[in-house]
Every structure is written in C-alpha cells, then in structure tokens.
Regions:
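A short helix-loop-beta-strand connector motif used in the catalytic cores of GNAT acetyltransferases and
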Residues: 31-42, 60
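Conserved GNAT acetyl-CoA-binding A-motif
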Residues: 89-101
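Conserved active-site alpha-helix within GNAT-family acetyltransferase domains
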Residues: 81, 98-121
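A conserved beta-turn-beta hairpin within the catalytic core of GNAT-like acetyltransferases
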Residues: 57-65, 75
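A short beta-loop-alpha structural element at the N-terminal edge
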Residues: 1-13
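Conserved beta-hairpin
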Residues: 39-53
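Conserved acetyl-CoA pyrophosphate-binding loop and the N-cap/start of the following alpha-helix
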Residues: 74-83
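Helix-loop element at the rim of GNAT/NAT acetyltransferase active sites that forms part
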Residues: 16-27
Length: 121
C-alpha cells in the first residue's frame, strides 16, 4: 500500500472510481481541472490506484474532504482509514470536516456528527 499526491497519469483511474460510484458528472476534463483547483491523494495497491480523497485546506484551521472513495473490490481492508490517517499525519493541527452518509465509518474514527451543513443543488 502506498499513498501519494495524485498526478496527471492518475486521472483515468480517478475517473473510473468515480464512475463506479455513479458520479456521472465527473468527466476526464472535470477531474483534470480538480487536480489543479484542489488536492487529491491516491492509495495504490500493487501499482493500482484503488482509492482517493479530494480535499481543500487552508493548512491552518480547516481541511474539508470533498470525496473519499475506495473501489468496491477493495473496501473493508482499511484503505479509507489509511487515507484519513495520512491526512491526519500531514495536517496534524487542522480540523477535518466533511459531509457524509457513512456515519458509522467516521464515528469509528472519532469524528463527531455535528448535524450542520447546507447544500444548494
């Protein structure tokens, strides 16, 4: 298992993972733009990208996770937790925030459900 910053050659893998999740608005072009405007880290297993997280941060106060996803065939193996642990190690003094429906996963990692957040379509 290896975690690193995403590079241009990862765009196709990120696209395929997003498509697996049914995220039809994620095009190759959009992912290319996201690689410029936000930060993406990937997790590799046997030289295959099996998951990624995209986030925004000011590196001082807040880190906001916009996506965290692992391929369906690689779930329940600790890879999502490894991505979170990587963020915690890289940004030890910032607060991590996110919106998610996977409450049990994040609660196991000691995230608190603060019940706030709003979204415009």
């Amino acid at each position: 298992m290896f975690i690193r910053n995403a590079i241009d050659t990862d765009i196709q893998s990120i696209y395929e993972i997003a498509q697996q999740e049914g995220w039809k608005t994620f095009s190759i072009e959009k992912i290319q733009q996201l690689l410029i405007t936000s930060r993406i880290i990937v997790i590799e297993v046997n030289n295959e990208v099996v998951g990624y997280t995209r986030f925004l941060t000011d590196e001082t106060v807040t880190l906001y996770i916009t996506e965290l996803v692992v391929t369906k065939t690689h779930r329940k193996k600790g890879y999502a937790k490894a991505l979170i642990d990587y963020l915690l190690a890289q940004f030890p003094s910032v607060r991590i925030e996110l919106l998610s429906e996977n409450n049990s996963f994040y609660e196991k990692l000691h995230f608190r459900n603060i019940g706030t957040g709003y979204r415009l379509p």
